[in-house]
């Protein structure tokens, strides 16, 4: 009898949760269809303006020389204990200090940390990984292989597999989302965090529900919920949408050279090269709604005032979840989303100051 009473009392809450999830998914796919129409028009325009490129992306047969620059470190592979997957990484400065682990975003790879690898290898063991699905790292095809839980276990296995019990975690964009959650579920493995242009998913969900303008900034996330179509649209006219994302005069990465652009496009141009990265997004809303969680890891947060994809209000929202005194946040005036590549000197100054006590 008590079980029946409890079930009856919980029924309204469960029904409300199901209705909320149904509403959320209907909203997600409605926006996804609108985004697909918009991006379809953009992709078609690129094809019409550049007919010689055709409707498909050109497969690159050789990687650009900048990916083999010895000044950035040595290339290696790590077999992960939990999944058996093999992840690619670039490492420099082993034996020079604590482990500094870099997590990249989309549409990037380990190479997005080239400035930081050079800057910090004198005092830290710097390691930039290609997350699962990216670059030469293993890329399972199944969408279910890219859940947040599995990605967090990958990070844990990288830290332990490199022979460390903790690290300084430096992350941008998608890597930032993973870093936030990693610090919650594996706090003993994170000594400090440096987070650039990225919010915890629970903060992002709550903020977006109250600020519809953030939904519009994140329109691409909804497009990526759809199967196969995003891969097709992003590859049309030789990956022109990705090229524009990375090189746009106002919203892209300033001074990105043709060779550096190819460093990002090379692996995306391989068969199935976009599916793994897009599967991250296809798992993004699975656990909606997320419960807010307290953040306790000492963290340096850097945010571009002109970030195209994320509103400034998210900085305050992130701060409200922190234990007092654990967050140091800086908004960089006139700077956009790609801080590690567009403004490395400013980023390095903040990082050295934030980490100085670990080096004394």
UniProtKB/Swiss-Prot annotation:
Q: How is its activity regulated?
A: Inhibited by 1-(1-acetylpiperidin-4-yl)-3-(4-(trifl uoromethoxy)phenyl)urea (TPAU), 1-cyclohexyl-3-dodecylurea (CDU), 12-(3-adamantan-1-yl-ureido)-dodecanoic acid (AUDA), 1-((3S, 5S, 7S)-adamantan-1-yl)-3-(5-(2-(2-ethoxyethoxy) ethoxy)pentyl)urea (AEPU) and to a lesser extent by 8-(3-((3S, 5S, 7S)-adamantan-1-yl)ureido) octanoic acid (AUOA).
Q: In UniProt terms, what is the effect of altering residue 220 to F? A: Loss of catalytic activity
Transmembrane region(s): 22-42
| Location(s) in or outside the cell | Microsome membrane
Q: What is its EC number?
A: 3.3.2.10
Family (UniProt): Belongs to the AB hydrolase superfamily. Epoxide hydrolase family.
Kindly indicate whether the keyword Lipid metabolism belongs to this entry. Answer: yes
* Result after altering residue 280 to F: No effect on catalytic activity
Signal peptide positions are none
**Topological relation to the membrane, as annotated:** Single-pass membrane protein
An example of a Gene Ontology BP annotation on this entry?
epoxide metabolic process
Protein name per the record: Epoxide hydrolase 3
- What lineage does UniProt assign to this protein's organism? Eukaryota, Metazoa, Chordata, Craniata, Vertebrata
Purpose of the protein: Catalyzes the hydrolysis of epoxide-containing fatty acids. Active in vitro against epoxyeicosatrienoic acids (EETs) including 8,9-EET, 9,10-EET, 11,12-EET and 14,15-EET and leukotoxin.
Q: Per its record, what are the GO molecular function terms? A: epoxide hydrolase activity; hydrolase activity
**So where's the catalytic machinery, residue-wise?**
173, 281, 337
Q: Which GO terms describe its cellular component?
A: endoplasmic reticulum; intracellular membrane-bounded organelle; membrane
Q: Which PANTHER family match?
A: EPOXIDE HYDROLASE
Q: Which catalysed reactions does the entry list for this protein? A: an epoxide + H2O = an ethanediol; 9,10-epoxyoctadecanoate + H2O = 9,10-dihydroxyoctadecanoate; 9,10-epoxy-(12Z)-octadecenoate + H2O = 9,10-dihydroxy-(12Z)-octadecenoate; 8,9-epoxy-(5Z,11Z,14Z)-eicosatrienoate + H2O = 8,9-dihydroxy-(5Z,11Z,14Z)-eicosatrienoate
Pfam families (alphabetical): Abhydrolase_1
Q: Which UniProt keywords apply?
A: Endoplasmic reticulum, Hydrolase, Lipid metabolism, Membrane, Microsome, Transmembrane, Transmembrane helix
